[in-house]
Amino acid sequence: MKLLLFTALVLVVISLIEVEAENERACIPLEKECTKTPGNCCSGLKCNCYRRFEQGVAKGIQCWCIEKDVTYKGV
């Protein structure tokens, strides 16, 4: 009986881990931030990163999912 309960508990834990991993793999849509997970943009998109400056001082890097083969230029 103890073995059966232990096996059921292990299966539940494994299932929860798999569900959590699937949620982390969910793709990031267009124009959403991908700084922490650059490989998770939806198909047809790429994670493009920019270094942000405020008054000449670097304030970190931010990344966004954008369309592949699209180039953005400053105005």
Swiss-Prot record:
<keyword id="KW-0732">Signal</keyword>
<dbReference type="GO" id="GO:0005576">
    <property type="term" value="C:extracellular region"/>
</dbReference>
<keyword id="KW-0800">Toxin</keyword>
<feature type="disulfide bond">
    <location>
        <begin position="49"/>
        <end position="63"/>
    </location>
</feature>
<dbReference type="Pfam" id="PF10530">
    <property type="entry name" value="Toxin_35"/>
</dbReference>
<keyword id="KW-1015">Disulfide bond</keyword>
<dbReference type="InterPro" id="IPR019553">
    <property type="entry name" value="Spider_toxin_CSTX_knottin"/>
</dbReference>
<feature type="propeptide">
    <location>
        <begin position="22"/>
        <end position="25"/>
    </location>
</feature>
<comment type="similarity">
    <text>Belongs to the neurotoxin 19 (CSTX) family. 06 (U6-Lctx) subfamily.</text>
</comment>
<dbReference type="GO" id="GO:0090729">
    <property type="term" value="F:toxin activity"/>
</dbReference>
<protein>
    <recommendedName>
        <fullName>U6-lycotoxin-Ls1c</fullName>
    </recommendedName>
</protein>
<feature type="disulfide bond">
    <location>
        <begin position="27"/>
        <end position="42"/>
    </location>
</feature>
<keyword id="KW-0964">Secreted</keyword>
<feature type="signal peptide">
    <location>
        <begin position="1"/>
        <end position="21"/>
    </location>
</feature>
<feature type="disulfide bond">
    <location>
        <begin position="34"/>
        <end position="47"/>
    </location>
</feature>
<feature type="disulfide bond">
    <location>
        <begin position="41"/>
        <end position="65"/>
    </location>
</feature>
